[in-house]
Amino acid sequence: MDHLLAENYPQFDYQLLDTGELQKLEQFGPHRFIRPAPQAIWPKSLSSTEWKKAEGEYKYFKGKDTGGEWKFFTQTPKDGWNIQFHNLFFKVQPTGFGHIGLFPEQAPNWLWIINHLKQLNDKEIKVLNIFGYTG
């Protein structure tokens, strides 16, 4: 299976820009965010200048009922925005528990579904993705 790299998915409005120091820097369409990545124990690769371009950051707090909260540095659309993967559109928006509304690592599965749907010659079907945790 392909790794989730921009060059493997040129038609995806998502990019994992950097990871390190227990964080990940991600681009969802025009918006950039910092979220926790507990297994990213290595140093960050990009400069602090690049990380400071983030529009928001989600941090965990001990004792907080929700586990954490967002701090936004700029205004993002309250009702979310759309990002594209091939001919699929996903509505995304930061949630109170640190998610954005989709799991980019599911891209190989979406591509598999797209490729198999093409073989059905527009026959109507229903798909249930039981591996895409949605919260």
Q: Model segments located where?
A:
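Single, functionally critical "micro-switch" positions that shape active/binding sites
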Residues: 28-29, 130
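Short acidic/polar capping segments at secondary-structure boundaries
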Residues: 96-98, 132-135
